[in-house]
Amino acid sequence: MQLYLTVRPEDTRTASAYPAGLAHAAYRIGEGSSLLSRNLLTPARSGPMAPLPGLLVLSDRSAPSIDRPAALAEAVLRECARRSYGGIVLDFDEPSREDRRRFAALLGQQCAKSRKLFCLPPSYAGAAEHPTVIVNTAISGGSFETHIREELARYGGGRNVVFDLQRLRMDFRLPARSGQGEPLTQAALDALLKERQPAVFFSKDLFACYFTYAKNGESHFILFDDADTLRQKLRLGRQLGVAAAFFQWPEVCDIADSLFRRK
């Protein structure tokens, strides 16, 4: 399993010190189906470990319609060749849109020919002939292992799946009938842990830590990931043959030393 850190341009130098490839979240779709990018400087990595090829992450957030899919695909592939990227990640909003699906199908064909990794959100999986589907690992109910096995079966096995290892930090007010919780920042979670000093438990079903507390007559269930739980999710992914895993650098920068066991 290959590991990647999804980074903004300003984070590349710090993140490049860790034993993971870099997925560069520096690209978006502009007017006229153009490829726009932020200033990007990819530093050479020092040390004994050879770096993995980087990946291009393309966002469609607030982007116009892709009316020239071939031109955009050509621009993306040129950028990959210029920077020696080993693959492409489509960070597209859901639900899927037809213009995005046409573009994904065309780009997927080109990536298959050049043997580049091509990662798609689940709603776009049917747009490409040989997609590698991004599966989010942050679940708050049921069994994590069962969920992952079902996703792998849906997409033809681990070789066709990459993990989006989102760091879970959620506050559920009980009873949580909707299954939806309130996202917590790390600062808010740290403040709760310091204030409440709760007994923290590990959920074998969810592969996550949890604790409970009461406030203003309401019961709260806090579910969160740390470096250990993320490593356990990685371990299961490796056992099941998952192709790669992505961490969002802003989510894990505070635990990166522990996560990667940096010495």
Which sequence ranges carry the predicted segments?
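Short acidic, glycine/proline-enriched helix-loop-strand junctions
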Residues: 98-101, 107-116, 201-210, 254-263
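Chitinase-like catalytic core of GlcNAc-active glycosidases
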Residues: 1-141
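Acidic/aromatic/glycine-rich contiguous surface patches that form carbohydrate-binding/processing clefts
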Residues: 233-263
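A generic secondary-structure signal
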Residues: 75-82, 109, 150-154, 232-240
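Active-site region of glycoside hydrolase catalytic domains
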Residues: 101-102, 116-117, 128-132, 149-175
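A structural signal for short, well-ordered beta-strand segments and their strand-loop junctions
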Residues: 89-91, 117-122, 160-166, 246-248
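Glycan-binding loop/region signatures in secreted carbohydrate-active enzymes
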Residues: 160, 165-233
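A structural signal for the main folded, soluble domain(s) of proteins
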Residues: 33-36, 41, 63, 70-74, ...
